[in-house]
């Protein structure tokens, strides 16, 4: 029975992945998704700003819970650059230095990843101070990177709220929570996740700088 059901499923997936069917599926899905968000936008207009803030907080908390639940239970294995910079962090933690010739001269070829390995070693050193078992080092590091992702999303939410409205910011939160990449990227420990809060935080401060009328506060944001 299992073999028959798998065969039927694969046969159905082949039909869906047909270029013509796939295009129609994507168009239909996008139209449905946009229509749904327009409807939600109209419903949000009927809520007060305070209620929209509560709704945003609820959506965000739900998204964070799902992120950490998946991170803890899936326990994804790092590969390629993600694995190299994690191993580099461990090497610095255990030996105090980083070899530029080990692993086929990885850090000699990609010296810009040295800073990521150093950052990882700092986080791992803090984890070690709390006497967390070594088998949880990777998970602990992933939790920190996941926090950085969510911090970047928070700065993005602040930007949308400043430039547009609380309704648009709430829609942005819903869009972020329903974006699969928010959960896929949570497993990685690399440049994209590390730089996200720095990039969005810088943009947030720059927007505050442009909108601020008080010169002394401009200096603070600048």
Q: Where would I find each of the regions flagged by the language model?
A:
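Hydrophobic core segments of transmembrane alpha-helices in multi-pass, intramembrane catalytic enzymes
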Residues: 28-32, 85-87, 91, 149-153, ...
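Short helix- or helix-capping micro-motifs
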Residues: 63, 172-180
């Amino acid at each position: 029975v299992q073999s028959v059901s798998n065969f039927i499923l694969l046969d159905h997936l082949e039909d869906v992945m047909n270029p013509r069917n796939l295009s129609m599926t994507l168009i239909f899905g996008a139209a449905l998704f946009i229509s749904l968000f327009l409807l939600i936008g109209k419903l949000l207009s009927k809520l007060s700003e305070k209620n929209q803030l509560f709704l945003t907080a609820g959506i965000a908390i739900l998204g964070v819970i799902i992120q950490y639940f998946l991170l803890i239970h899936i326990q994804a294995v790092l590969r390629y650059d993600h694995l190299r910079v994690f191993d580099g962090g461990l090497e610095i933690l255990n030996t105090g230095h980083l070899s530029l010739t080990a692993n086929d001269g990885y850090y000699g070829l990609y010296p810009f990843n040295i800073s990521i390995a150093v950052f990882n070693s700092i986080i791992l050193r803090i984890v070690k101070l709390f006497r967390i078992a070594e088998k949880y080092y990777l998970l602990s590091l992933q939790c920190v990177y996941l926090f950085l992702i969510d911090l970047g999303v928070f700065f993005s939410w602040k930007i949308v709220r400043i430039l547009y409205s609380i309704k648009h910011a709430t829609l942005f939160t819903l869009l972020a929570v329903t974006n699969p990449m928010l959960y896929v990227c949570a497993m990685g420990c690399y440049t994209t996740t590390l730089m996200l809060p720095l990039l969005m935080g810088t943009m947030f401060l720059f927007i505050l700088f442009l909108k601020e009328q008080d010169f002394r506060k401009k200096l603070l944001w600048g």
